[in-house]
From Swiss-Prot:
Keywords: Disulfide bond, Glycosidase, Hydrolase
Name of the protein this chain belongs to: Alpha-galactosidase
Entry's Gene Ontology molecular function annotations: alpha-galactosidase activity
Broad class of enzyme this protein falls into: hydrolase
Enzyme Commission numbers on file: 3.2.1.22
Membrane-spanning residues: none
Family according to the record: Belongs to the glycosyl hydrolase 27 family.
Catalytic activity: Hydrolysis of terminal, non-reducing alpha-D-galactose residues in alpha-D-galactosides, including galactose oligosaccharides, galactomannans and galactolipids
């Protein structure tokens, strides 16, 4: 939940 970095990209997930 929240913002996490994946493979150097920022993704917003609820």
């Amino acid at each position: 939940l929240g913002i996490y970095s994946d493979a150097g990209t920022q993704t917003c997930s609820k």
